Every structure is written in C-alpha cells, then in structure tokens.
Design a protein with these regions (language model features):
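Mature N-terminal, pre-catalytic/accessory segment of carbohydrate-active enzymes
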Residues: 1-76
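Active-site-adjacent "subsite" loops/lids of carbohydrate-active enzymes
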Residues: 40-43, 52, 120-179
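The substrate-binding groove and active-site-proximal loops of carbohydrate-active enzymes
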Residues: 43-54, 88-101, 152-170, 228-241, ...
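Catalytic domains of carbohydrate-active enzymes, especially glycoside hydrolases
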Residues: 57-84, 178-183, 287-291, 348-353
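Aromatic-lined substrate-binding rim segments of carbohydrate-active enzymes
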Residues: 63, 80-123, 235-254
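Aromatic- and acidic-residue-enriched segments that line the glycan-binding/catalytic groove
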Residues: 87-97, 126-152, 188-223
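Glycoside hydrolase catalytic-domain groove-lining segments
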Residues: 207-332
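Substrate-binding cleft of secreted/luminal carbohydrate-active enzymes
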Residues: 287-303, 310, 318-378
C-alpha cells in the first residue's frame, strides 16, 4: 500500500524533471540559433582517426557531414613517428592499408569532392601504438629512441637530436606535401617534457656543440643544480626548430602553395624550456602559415586571455586559428554553448578562424546545433 501511495508522487517528480530538461534543451537550441555566423573564416576540425568518424561513416561520409555543418577544413592524423596510413616511401605503412585502403587517397578524394581543405596531421617523434614492434626494435637497437633522466628507455619516442630521426620527420612531411595535400600539419613537434632526452647520443652531440666534455650527466643540464641549463635549452630547441625550418623551406620550394602549420602548446614563456617548442621564434621567422595553439579550457574568459597572450607572442607574420577543446570538456550537454562562446571569442579578437578537437561521435552530436547559428552558411 505504501509503494502504491508513493508511485504517483515519484511519477510526477520524473515527469517534472523531464519537462525541465526539455525546456533547458529548447532554450539552448534557441540561444544557439540566434548566434551570428561569419562567412569566409577558416573552420577546421582535427581528426585523430585515420579513417574519419568510423562506424558507418567512411571518409566520404565524414567529410560530407563536416561540410554540411559549415566547416571547410579537416586535419586528419594520417602519420606518426613510425607509421603511415598511406603508401609511403619514407615511413613504414600501417598493416590496415592492405585491407582498408590508402587513407590519404580516400580523404583527399572526399575533400576535393566537397570543397574541404585537407591539412595532413603528422605526429612527430612519437611512434604511436600502430607502429610495428619490428620497427620499434630497429630504432632502439640503432640508438634512435629516447632515454629519460633516470636512464629509462622511452621506446616509442624517437630522439630529436639524432640526425637520422630529424631527416625522417623532414622527409615524411615533404612527401605528404608532394602527394597533393593542401597543407602539412606538425603535432608533437617537441620533446615529451623536460625529463628527456638524455641518451648517449644526446650527450655526445651536446658535448660537440659545447666544445668540451660534460662530466656530471645529466645533473649538469637537468635538475635544481644544473649549471648548463641555458645551453641545454638552446640545444634542445635547436633540434626541434631545425626540423620546422627545413620543412618550411623545402615545402615552399618543392610543393609551392602547400601550407605548413602546427598544433602548439600555449605558454610562450615556458614552452621553449619545458618541451623545447620555441614557437614564438618559428612564427616571427614566418616558418608557419598558421598556428593552432591547443587552448583546451572550458572557460571562455580564460580561453580569450590565452589567445590574446599568444597573439602578442606571434606577431603579424602567421595566422592564428586557436584550438578549441570540445572533446576535452565535461560532457554535460552544454558543450554546444561552450563551443559557440569560444568561437565568438575568436571573432571578437579579430582572428580569421579556429580549429576544434576532435572530430568524433561527440562532434556528430554538437555540429548540427552549431549549424543553426555560428557555422550557418547563409
């Protein structure tokens, strides 16, 4: 009898909660539909999968969906430090290319069909989980993988100071540019952190750059008592910057019209020292055509503040298309509003576009909401 008496009350509570949720959803849709669009801006999505959205959406269906929802560029992750998802003369080819096909050719065909720009995303140094164990073993045996400050092997990370590794990254990017991409896009163009690399090769090459031996290794360059910290930072940033400069020079010479861009960390003051990514220098030198800082924060105010700092550090030679972290936010149903607010912040700062992470199932849900407002094609 008690259960029977409670049932109507519980039912009413559920109905009230459902009605309130539906009202909030309707208000959100109405708010999004009122947001103005901005024709002609660069609207891109990073896609971490080499196969598009996946499931029943191949590259053709994925790019069609992207275009239908107001975006005009895609940055597909088709290459890592030790594997390519396409026919390559530089990198080992992923096993699934034999069964699923050449991802570069598939994505490019879809992009040409629907009028979407294709900037191929290359993860540098990090060989990733799709790289064969045989290639990992080969790199480790040749002394081409990283070692951390405690002497532990980082088998999936290629050492950025090794000349052969630098050449591998350069050749892979140039090959992609010459295959017919609209652009080539650096990612992980940095060290994993300040704790690497301290392999024997790094020591020898650093000593050669200094002109004398370093006896306290790695203590002389790493840690609270490091006496050669400035020289070490210069050495590490030089290894990374050399690749960026060479790729920019060769792509502009060998594949004119193909753009060079990068996904970047977001702190101009600390990034050169911590991860050896001296992106302010790259931008001032004009090596990049556009830069996408990974400004993955939920707050629109914090996002705006970060982007403003980056604008000051970059100067006028390079376009900024800030990275917005849709897939990194709490999935609470309001991500469409949050994304729209950050897009509006980009516009308020006078920038010509933005880049969203990541093109996945969550994006499939959110993009149709944006299409009614901020990415509407008038």
């Amino acid at each position: 009898a008690l259960a029977y008496a409670l049932a109507p009350s519980l039912k009413g509570k559920i109905e009230a909660q459902t009605a309130a949720a539906e009202k909030r959803a309707a208000e959100m849709r109405a708010w999004l539909a009122e947001r103005p669009s901005k024709p002609g801006e660069h609207r891109a999505f990073w896609c971490h999968s080499a196969r598009g959205l996946g499931g029943d959406r191949d590259w053709d269906a994925s790019i069609r969906f992207l275009k239908e929802n107001g975006f005009n560029a895609v940055i597909p992750n088709l290459a890592w430090g030790g594997v390519a998802f396409y026919s390559s003369q530089v990198l080992p080819v992923a096993a699934d290319v034999a069964t699923k096909g050449d991802a570069f050719a598939q994505c490019r065909a879809a992009c040409r069909k629907y009028g979407v720009k294709m900037h191929v995303w290359k993860v540098c140094w990090n060989m990733g989980s799709h790289t064969s164990k045989a290639f990992e073993d080969q790199m480790a045996a040749a002394g081409r993988t990283q070692v951390d400050a405690k002497g532990r092997a980082l088998r999936r990370w290629l050492c950025p100071s090794h000349p052969a590794n630098q050449q591998l990254e350069i050749d892979a990017m140039v090959e992609l540019a010459k295959k017919g991409a609209d652009g080539v896009h650096f990612d992980y163009i940095r060290y994993p952190g300040g704790e690497s690399c301290f392999c024997a090769g790094c020591r020898a090459r650093f000593e050669a750059a200094l002109g004398h031996a370093v006896t306290n290794w790695p203590g002389a360059v790493y840690g609270a008592k490091a006496t050669l910290k400035r020289e070490w930072t210069r050495f590490r940033t030089g290894n990374i910057s050399r690749v960026v400069e060479t790729v920019a020079t060769r792509v502009r010479r060998e594949a004119p019209g193909v753009q060079v861009s990068a996904a970047l960390f977001r702190n101009p003051a600390s990034d050169p020292e911590t991860v050896a990514q001296d992106w302010p220098a790259w931008c001032r030198a004009g090596w990049l055509d556009f830069a996408c800082h990974m400004d993955y924060v939920e707050s629109a105010a914090m996002f705006r503040s970060q982007v403003r700092t980056q604008m000051e550090a970059v100067g006028k030679k390079v376009k900024l298309y800030p990275g917005i972290g849709l897939s990194c936010w709490e999935n609470d149903g309001t991500d469409g509003v949050r994304l729209a607010k950050q897009i509006e912040a980009v516009r308020e700062l006078g920038l010509g576009g933005f880049t969203v992470f990541n093109f996945d199932r969550r994006a499939e849900r959110v993009l149709p909401l944006l299409r009614t407002g901020v990415t509407r094609e008038d």
